[in-house]
C-alpha cells in the first residue's frame, strides 16, 4: 500500500518542478522586455488580444471555446507574464520575484496559492489578472472589504491602465450605473458580498438593461481566499422583503429565560452552541406561560421562541459574538474580528438577541432570493485564490471548489521562532504571565502585537496594561476606523498593539528602524482560536520576508476552547503531576498537540456545518438555475413570447381537465367545474356552455379550450397595434407570475429547512425529506406560475392607451 505522506511529498515536488519550469520560461523573456521602449511594451496588449480573438474566431460551441481559450492562455503565459513583470517595474517600481511568478502560474491554473505574509500576494496577482483580462470576458478580483478593493484598484490600477486595460471598483452602495461601469471594465475589484448580492439582484430585474453584470461570471481571483471560501461559507446570502411584523413572543420568551438557573433549569452544550431546558426548566415554563404541556404540538411557535431566547442569552456573548452599536445588534465575524455589516442571524435568533439586549426588535424578513458563497463561486468558469494559510483546509477546498492548495516557497528563509504553548490553570494566572512578558519586552523597546479572541478580552487586557502604565493601541470591532494606521505602526520601536483577529490580515506590519536588532516583532496570543488557520495568520505577522521575530501562545484551562474540548484530559495530567499552584505553567509540545487535536475537532464540526449548508443549497441550486435561465430567456426575447405563453396555457388546461375528468365514466365528469375554470381564466362569461363540452373526449375538451384561448390571444394581439407592446405585455405578465411564486417558494423552503431537522427524531433523514418536499413544492410552484400567467394574460382588458 502506498504511503499517503510520501505521495503528498512527491506530488508537491512535481508541482514545484512544473512551476519552476514556467518561471524559467518567463525569466527567459526578461532581457527582451527590458530592451523594449514603453510604447513597444504597451503595444503587446493589443497583439495578445488579437491572438486570442484569432484562436476563438471559428469556435462556436461553448465547451470547445473554453478549452481553446485555456490552451491559448497557457501558450501566451510566459510572454504575457514577462510583459506584466517589466511593466510593474516601470510603473510601480516593483519587480516580481521568481516565487511570485510561480504563485501567478498557480492562479492562472485555477488553484490556490498559499503564500506567507509579506511575500507580495497583491503583486503576484497582477500577472495572472493581466493575462486573463486579455480575453475581454472580465476578471473579478475579490477582496474581503471595500477598503481593500479601493486600495488595490488604485495601486495596481496604475499598472493595468498603463498596459491598456480598464479597471473598475464595485462598491456596495454605488448606484446601478456605477456598478455597471465597474463590471464592464476589463478588471473589476469587488467584495464577495457585493458580487453575491449583485448576482441575486440581477436575477430579479424586469429589463435586460437593468442588469449590472452584463458578461456573466468568467474568472475570479480571490484575495484572502480561505476567509471568503471557508469562513463565510456557513452564512448564505439572502435578499429579504418585508415580513409579517414582530412577534410579541420574543419579549415574553426572553423574560422567561432570564428567570432560569444554570444546571437546575437548563444545560449549555458548548460544543454545539445550544442550550436545552431540563425537566425543571420545562415545568417552570408551563407555570410561566400557564400551559399544561410546554411542548404541545400546537404550540411550536412558543417553543421555537424559547429555544432561540435560550441560545441568545446563554450561547451568544456580547463583545464576543456581537456588539451593540447605535441601538443595533451587529455580528462579529469570528475569523476576522470585524463587524459583519448588514448581516443578521436567521430563524428569529437575531430578534432574540435584540430582546435580550433591550434594543428595538426588527421584524423578521421574508426570503426572496438566496445563494451560498460555495454555489456562487462554483459558477465561475475559472476560480483561483491566494492566502497565507489554507493548507489545513486543503481537503474542503478540493472537494467543494475543485482547487488544489499549492504552497509557494518564500523568497527568503523564515527566521521566526514559534515557541511551544504555555498553559496555566486559570485565566488570571495566564494574564499575569502575559503582562509580565509584555513589560519585559516593552522595556527594551521590542514591538509587540498581542492577539486576543474577542472584543471583551482585548478590552480586559487593555485595562490591565493601563493599570501597569504600558502605553498601547487597541484594535477591535468597536475601534476599526484606524485599522490600517494602527497595524502599519505596530512594527515601530516600543509599539504595543492589542488586537482581535482583525490583526491577522490586510495591511503588512513592517519593522521600524533598529527593531531588527531587538529581535523583530513579538507576537503574543492570549488564547488559541478554534481554527488553526487563524492562529497561523497571527503567527505570520512576525518574521515577514526573512525578518526576525517570535510567536508565543498563552493558554489556560478556563479558555473557551479548552472547556469545550480539552480541559478534562489536560486537567487530569495536571493533577497527576501535582501541579496545583496558581502560578504553575506547563510548557510542553504535548499540550500544543492536544490543543491542535481539539482545533481539528472544531474544524471538522465547522466543515460539516458548511457542507450541510451546501447540501441544502444544492437542492435549491438546480431550481434556481432553471428559474434564472427562464427569466433570462424571457427578458432577452426580442420578437414574441407566444412560444412560452401558449404552452403554459396548454399545460394549465391539461391540469384542470385531468382533475375534473378523472372518473372513467364520462357521465361523472365535472363539466360545470371546467366551465367555471374557463370563465375565470380563459374566456368571457357565457362564451362556453356545458352543451359545448358534452359528449367530447378528454382530449377534445382540451382542444376546445385551447382553441378558445388561442383565439383570445389573437384578439389581444390585434388590439395591441405595435408588436413591441405585445411583447412587453407578455414579459410583464410572465415575470410577475414567476417572481411572485418563486419568492414565495424560496421563503417556504427557508422555513422548511429550519424545521426539517426535527424529523430526524422520527428516524427520517432530514436532507432527503427536504429534497422530496422541495421537489414537490417546485412542481406545484410551476403549476401556480402557469395558472396565474394564463389567467392574467387571458383576462386582461386591453385599452388603446395601454403602455406596457
From Swiss-Prot:
A GO molecular function for this record? ATP binding
Q: Which residues bind ATP?
A: 100, 118-122, 508
Q: Might you give the EC number(s) for this enzyme?
A: 7.4.2.8
PANTHER family in the record: CHLOROPLAST PROTEIN-TRANSPORTING ATPASE, SECA INNER MEMBRANE COMPONENT OF SEC PROTEIN SECRETION SYSTEM
Q: What is its main location?
A: membrane
Q: Give the first-level EC class, as a single word.
A: translocase
- GN (gene name): secA
Record-linked CDD domains: DEXDc_SecA, SF2_C_secA
Q: What does this protein do?
A: Part of the Sec protein translocase complex. Interacts with the SecYEG preprotein conducting channel. Has a central role in coupling the hydrolysis of ATP to the transfer of proteins into and across the cell membrane, serving as an ATP-driven molecular motor driving the stepwise translocation of polypeptide chains across the membrane.
Q: Which organism is it from?
A: Leuconostoc citreum (strain KM20)
Membrane topology summary: Peripheral membrane protein
Q: What GO terms in the biological process aspect are recorded for it?
A: intracellular protein transmembrane transport; protein import; protein targeting; protein transport by the Sec complex
Q: How does it assemble?
A: Monomer and homodimer. Part of the essential Sec protein translocation apparatus which comprises SecA, SecYEG and auxiliary proteins SecDF. Other proteins may also be involved.
Name used for this protein in its record: Protein translocase subunit SecA
**Localized where?**
Cell membrane; Cytoplasm
Q: Which family does it belong to?
A: Belongs to the SecA family.
List keywords of the entry alphabetically: ATP-binding, Cell membrane, Cytoplasm, Membrane, Nucleotide-binding, Protein transport, Translocase, Translocation, Transport
Q: Name one GO cellular component term.
A: cytosol
Catalysed reaction(s) here are:
ATP + H2O + cellular proteinSide 1 = ADP + phosphate + cellular proteinSide 2
- Name the InterPro entries on file: Helicase_ATP-bd (IPR014001), Helicase_C-like (IPR001650), P-loop_NTPase (IPR027417), SecA (IPR000185), SecA_CS (IPR020937), SecA_DEAD (IPR011115), SecA_motor_DEAD (IPR014018), SecA_preprotein_X-link_dom (IPR011130)
